[in-house]
Amino acid sequence: VGGAAAGGRRFGKGDWLRDGFGVWYKRRVRAVFFGTPEIAVPSLDALVGIADVVGVICQPDRPAGRGLELKAPPVKRRALELGLPVVQPVKVRTPDFAAWVKEREADVAVVIAYGRILPKGVLEAPRLGCMNLHASILPRYRGAAPITWAVVRGEEETGVSLMQMDEGMDTGPVFAIRCIPIGADETADELAVRVAALAAEVVREDLPRAVRGELAATAQDHAAATMAPLLEKKDGRVPWEKAAREVHDHVRGMTSWPGAFTSADGKMLKVLATKVAAAEGAGAAPGTVVAADRAGVRVACGAGEVAILRAQLEGRKALGAAELVAGRALRPGMVLGS
């Protein structure tokens, strides 16, 4: 489009704007943003830089802390700092909410980690529909917890997929995918920070191209899809019967929710950090503490051993390996998880 309209007339400085999408408009691209947790905040910041954000939708405030006081989600807090209008619908499958979204007259909705499946009426409300930033290399790890499950399953790479949303669970066609490696000892929390930055990069660089029609949306290979289901507390239980590498991946993947845990002397033990001490070999029964010194508490697995570097016994503060050994919280011969 450049600086001239059809027919050769130059766009007047006062009546046309060139927005962050690189397109000349009589107004900037209008966008609504759906997101709730911390991982979505950098994408909101990126979107504000390239479009007029005419509405921010996040989940309701939730009770948190010992006092169970209502706490606003990170996206709400950031949106209010930016002076953006925020709504927190209890239900999204209502005609009133779909009407509210439509009344924003948005060109596009940008969604990242909102936490709910949007109905057809909402998906179709913006002119170009809803575009989702999903934290995986689709079609792998569709679902609510892609970062956690990618780490737990020992993946060496993940990414962010920009997709056109449909009524399914992360099943829509994909505009672009950006990838990053996963460190061998990287936790899910650490990875989430890098994924958040990558998603913001997608917003700044790939979203504008999708809006301009420069990126074709490619259908996913549904036969190759894998799932990343919503996490439950029970998912954190350490599977000592698995190989040492898998146990280590489980611990680093389950941070910080639901947290990796086992039992010791009948009390819950949160396993906060580990390393692979021996990748192979089988000796003691899985879960048996085979050695305990300042370097770590070595625990037998189905194959090999892991060293617990940091843990927290029920009712006590988190301790490093040296403190765990000195206080005899973990001792050779103990069987964890029994």
Regions found by a protein language model. Give the residues of each.
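Extreme N-terminal basic, low-complexity initiation segments
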Residues: 2-12
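Donor/substrate-binding cores of folate-linked one-carbon enzymes
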Residues: 49, 108-227
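N-terminal Rossmann-like dinucleotide-binding module
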Residues: 28-67
